[in-house]
């Protein structure tokens, strides 16, 4: 229902958390501990840090597992933004309750508006690189100068005539970035710069 647009991210996460019923925090933490990042993400971060390229993680998921995954790989130093979740007790039943501190009234689909984070943290002369794969990335990519896309985001970029580099994992992103830097082609995209300018004017 979320992928079809019938419900948005706030409704989807709220329904998913409610469906968990009585939650045992330790069991949930064990499950999260079994999950992992793209194996090529830590080397990609190291590459970016060597080249003085800041990395920020934007997730429309929940903070407790984002934080867990970053700590698992020693990447908790990275700035990141996600929806919040906490355990609450209700008549002896422990439930996972989500909240959405970064929701935007201008964004109907997402719980964590990635577009707003991009605009708030960038300067006029910055060149923005965006890596994404899903529905929550759609509102952000038009503001990015360099876009890496896979899965659902490829189809969206194609439908909106947004240029992009296709990738399978962060090994592909790193390899492409190496070529872009070697060739001196890390330059602003005119349409993205105009979109950012229009957004700032509208604010």
Predicted feature residues:
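Amphipathic coiled-coil/heptad-repeat helices and related helical stalk/stem segments
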Residues: 37-41, 114, 134
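Alpha-helical substrate-recognition element adjacent to the catalytic core
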Residues: 1-84
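Substrate-recognition "cap/lid" segment bordering the active-site pocket of phosphatases
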Residues: 70-128
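Short, acidic/turn-prone active-site loops that include or flank metal/cofactor-
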Residues: 82-87, 152-156, 169-173
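P-loop/Walker A phosphate-binding loop and immediately adjacent motor/lid segment at beta-alpha junctions
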Residues: 101-116, 158-191
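Acidic, Mg2+-coordinating phosphoryl-transfer loop and its flanking beta/alpha structural elements
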Residues: 59-60, 124-166
